[in-house]
């Protein structure tokens, strides 16, 4: 009899433990990943900005659409690297993307449309490796070489 109660409580506990709803940053990541899986994408794209920016007060359920900008990186989509570890490609393609969001059974359904925005000026943030190299350059010792000499002929 006791084992029946334990089994019943375990089943009810499993039913009540539903997965957490999808967050806004997770929806942005999934949207960029789905764009990178398109066959025409040569180099992977990375999130450049989002409107609104991800933050504590932004909830996916209150948004009707995702609006974000992505930029081409130096990595290929087939590389198994996280896109955040890839540096932006110099003079890479920039795309403005938007699309309505509907959440069905904790899975976002996004009809994504992207347009070329490469002509718009943008400040490019380097990846982790680029930031590491910049820090090394900042702290390296300054070396000055001075060459002095004289020559006498005959």
Swiss-Prot record:
Grouped into one coarse class, the protein's main location is secreted
Which UniProt keywords are present, listed alphabetically? Antibiotic, Antimicrobial, Disulfide bond, Immunity, Innate immunity, Secreted, Signal
Biological process annotations from GO: antibacterial innate immune response; antimicrobial humoral immune response mediated by antimicrobial peptide; defense response to Gram-negative bacterium; defense response to Gram-positive bacterium; innate immune response; macrophage activation
Location of this chain's protein in the cell: Secreted
Which InterPro entries does UniProt cross-reference here? Cathelicidin-like (IPR001894), Cystatin_sf (IPR046350)
**May I ask which residue range the UniProt record assigns to the signal sequence?**
1-17
The GO terms describing molecular function are:
lipopolysaccharide binding
Secreted is among the record's keywords: yes
Cellular component, GO, one term: extracellular space
Keyword Secreted present in the record's keywords: the answer is: yes
Q: In which tissues is it expressed?
A: Detected in trachea, lung, proventriculus, duodenum, jejunum, ileum, caeca, colon, caecal tonsil, bursa of Fabricius, kidney, ovary, testis, thymus, liver, spleen, bone marrow, skin, uropygial gland, muscle and brain.
Q: List the disulfide bonds.
A: 75-86, 97-114
Q: Pro-sequence positions in this chain?
A: 18-122
Family per UniProt? Belongs to the cathelicidin family.
- Its biological function? Binds bacterial lipopolysaccharide (LPS). Has potent antimicrobial activity against Gram-positive and Gram-negative bacteria (in vitro). Has hemolytic activity (in vitro). May play a role in the innate immune response.
Record-given protein name: Cathelicidin-2
Look up and give the organism this protein is from: Gallus gallus (Chicken)
Question: Source gene?
Answer: CATHL2
């Amino acid at each position: 009899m006791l084992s029946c109660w334990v089994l019943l409580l375990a089943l009810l506990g499993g039913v009540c433990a539903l997965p957490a709803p999808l967050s806004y940053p997770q929806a942005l990541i999934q949207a960029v990943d789905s764009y990178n899986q398109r066959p025409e994408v040569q180099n992977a794209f990375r999130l450049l900005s989002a409107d609104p920016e991800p933050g504590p007060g932004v909830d996916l359920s209150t948004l009707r659409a995702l609006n974000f900008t992505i930029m081409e990186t130096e990595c290929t989509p087939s590389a198994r690297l996280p896109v955040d570890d890839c540096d932006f490609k110099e003079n890479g393609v920039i795309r403005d993307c938007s699309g309505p969001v509907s959440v069905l059974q904790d899975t976002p359904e996004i009809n994504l449309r992207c347009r070329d925005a490469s002509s718009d000026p943008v400040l490019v943030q380097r990846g982790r490796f680029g930031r590491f190299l910049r820090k090394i350059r900042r702290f390296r010792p300054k070396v000055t070489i001075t060459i002095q000499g004289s020559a006498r002929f005959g």
